[in-house]
């Protein structure tokens, strides 16, 4: 009888372990959950809060490019996430009726409570968390750069640019209200620019379309690591056959949106992934953006040229003590706009390109969207006048409020002469007048040539979306 009782206890322990999932998921109280979700990472989880004034230097000019704050899913993403309601029921049925699957019990309970609650009218608009991110960013910027931002507030002293897209405009308004007060619309009106969410004029460019259609990200989805991930997730959820890749990505979208929208939450769908799987999905997203908006396509750097040229023009004017220029410029745009601007400024460039086959070798990659392009991501250039050292004029760059240290600078503090020389090609009259697309492979034999100089107005509009 005693032996039978022992066997029953062992059986119960085994069943309990099966339901708890062992190492197949992290517990909600995990002291170190993996929360880096590529370009949909919550800003509050990654920004650098340790700002130190530059000794013997005073800021005289600030320029910032700011991505819109945390937003709700767009229409297509919302449709995909809503389909998880039926899928959720299948997962629960697998565990409770068919006794298949290996999810943690608390994750299964959390999954039962999960609901997708986003009003269709709010889709792709800034969220309350996004508004708070903008307010906090404005306060910190105002505190750090008080010497620049305490000047008389008017449209000549400060410039704010944003597209008319809701989430971008609302981000700019939240930031400006905190920075300049409730009357900012009269004192420092936001200059609206044409909304444009695509590379108009570049969609027929083979160099760009080939990078998208033949993306390394598509090949990565066929890699052994990726296929094994899909297989393991399917088994964990109790399916005898692999679930579709679209379901995996809907789960991932729900996970990262929920975390970004409610920072203190433990999203139900996040618990369905292991730490290693979240890292693999992060790499997939980074790889996708590397070829869409990154160094994987040569044309992307050219698209960012107009904004980089504008920035260098401002810095040059400050160096020449030109009084006919603003004290600060704030630009609000899209993820793609921020990234193509960073490309033009050689930020987050890896010595070895990201590919579908070097995932493990790219663990410490610079092109990590969670650190470069999270929600509310930003890049700033601050011009300093210094009393000591061999040069009065210095420039420091900040990526998500952390010092960005260009090689050749002193812990991030760069001499203006160094920056001027590094980006001299943006200071000439034809800084963006370069051929960026030539097609000699079409059957028609017609060459397609796109010149950035002809697309500068379009590129500027695109970069501000």
Residues of each region from the PLM?
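Hydrophobic h-region of N-terminal signal peptides that target proteins for export
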Residues: 12-20, 459-462
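Signature for phosphate-centric chemistry
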Residues: 20-159, 163-442
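Positively charged n-region of N-terminal signal peptides that target proteins for export
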Residues: 1-4, 464-465
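Compositionally biased regions
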Residues: 6-7, 17-21, 442-445, 449
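Sec-dependent signal peptide recognition
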Residues: 3-11, 450-454
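Cleavable C-terminal sorting propeptides in eukaryotic secreted/cell-surface proteins
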Residues: 443-465
